[in-house]
Amino acid sequence: VAILGDGEDSRQRDREARREGRRHKSSMVFQSFGLLPHKSVRDNVAYGLKVRGESKQVCTERALHWINTVGLKGYENKYPHQLSGGMRQRVGLARALAADTDIILMDEAFSALDPLIRAEMQDQLLELQKTLHKTIVFITHDLDEAVRIGNRIAILKDGKLIQVGTPREILHSPADEYVDRFVQRRAAVV
């Protein structure tokens, strides 16, 4: 599967261009938080900006803005081990948002959270997206989650793209037997 950035296939770029693209065009929220244990919440959120070469003032201002926005005001000087799983995931989200990239990759970002915190994080992401209008690639194995937060869903099997469509298209017009079974499995649980 190719990733296009500014209409260009990322696989065709040289190593340095791909590195620059990762620094300036995309940010990531990991399933296992990906926080630096020896850095405070503020420093974790500012980390991508620092690596990119932003000034200390810009790093601090953006970090504090996004810490407040994701509901962690008052926790900027805490360390990851002092936070709950949901709070740690908010730090990861704030770090991705602080970088102000065009694309945010979220790899199973909410899967390790309990159902209530997970729903809270989904709500927060949907609210933020109303004003951000970012391209968010949200990887999940949970069709309910995909239907809830996605405006387009891509279903893959064994590394191959099987179907892309709106949630409605996926649910009501499965492309093949695999997608149909995937959808039916969801219906059986509900």
Report each predicted region and the residues it spans.
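Helical segment within the ABC ATPase nucleotide-binding domain
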Residues: 118-133
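A short, surface-exposed alpha-helical micro-motif characterized by mixed small hydrophobic
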Residues: 146-148
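C-terminal boundary and immediately downstream tail of ABC-type ATPase nucleotide-binding domains
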Residues: 172-190
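Conserved H-loop
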Residues: 31, 133-139, 141-142
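ABC family nucleotide-binding domain
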Residues: 1-117, 121
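ABC ATPase "signature
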Residues: 164-165, 173
